[in-house]
Amino acid sequence: MDRLTLDQVKSVLERLPVRSVNLGTGENGMHPDFRAILAYLRTQPVKLTITSNGHSIAVLEDNELRAFHDIEFSLDYPTQDEQDMQRGAGNWALIHQQAARCVKLGVPVTIIAVMMKSNYLRLAEVARVAKEFGAPLRVNVYQSVRSDTYALSYGEYWEGFKRLLAETDVIAISEPLVRAMAGLPPLEGGCGVSTVRVTPRATTQPCVYWPGGGEPLSGLMASGIGILSSASFEQARAVPAACQACEFRDTCHGGCAGRRRLQGALLEPDYYCPIMRGERPRLEVRMAASRDLPKLSSCCTTVVMAR
């Protein structure tokens, strides 16, 4: 099984000017050195977050949980039967138990859902579940990393966001097309600019959804912040030629680079771009109070709060 070692984690933080660290990609609680790595990270001047199905939170002591700036729980459906069918029996209860525990400890909670064909019209309902814990809902669009079974059609993508934004208040949007159509200004940072993904295979990628194995960690050790000038990071920042004259260029940058790369169309506009189809949907948004959410700048995402 691929796993980063504690020494590799230390090396990454020594070579990069890190402000925040998210522990994602699978259940970190299954790593034999999870607690040792967490103990080290707690000594560093970084904002620490974790994404979990509940297991990695359940194995930690209360004092360890208090080290986190935010704890994310993966919940894709608003009912127990649907969630347990997708994630395994007992997952709904585990998430509710551990989210309630975090709230009791004063640790901020976020619910993270993937917008996909099976739930795209029901995410406002998931947001209402999140609100039971005083938590926002963070939404990532399904990316066809292994299969396109759950991938949204063009119409489903836009209908999903219209429904979601009609029933929730927006904390932040970094999903490029949605941000542009909501009339929000350009956002600094993002994939290929200010984030580095270090995989369990000890490789680096500019985006969590970037296809391929990634570049060996030795490249980061040699170049440090210079990793941002490597080929894959430059590709993640590339704006398609067809988008150069678009009025939304500075906000959208051609859409999600990871999605374009996955679809073998890095140099083409995002599949979900309405402008290329001669359309211009306007998304009406009502803003909520801002929150300090480090994950906002590390992926194309949307954060909302149920009304």
Language-model segments: residues:
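Conserved alpha-helical substructure of the radical SAM core
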Residues: 1-67
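Radical SAM enzyme [4Fe-4S]-AdoMet core and its adjacent flexible, acidic
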Residues: 4, 14, 35-39, 47, ...
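Short Fe-S-cluster ligation motifs
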Residues: 8-30, 270-307
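Conserved beta-strand edge residues that scaffold enzyme active sites
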Residues: 27, 55-56, 116-117, 143-144, ...
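Short glycine-rich, flexible loops that bind phosphorylated cofactors or substrates
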Residues: 30, 58, 80-81, 255
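Short secondary-structure boundary/hinge segments and terminal tails
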Residues: 31, 58-60, 120, 147-148, ...
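Residue-level signal for well-ordered alpha-helical positions
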Residues: 53, 63, 85-86, 210, ...
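Accessory C-terminal segments flanking Radical SAM cores
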Residues: 174-280
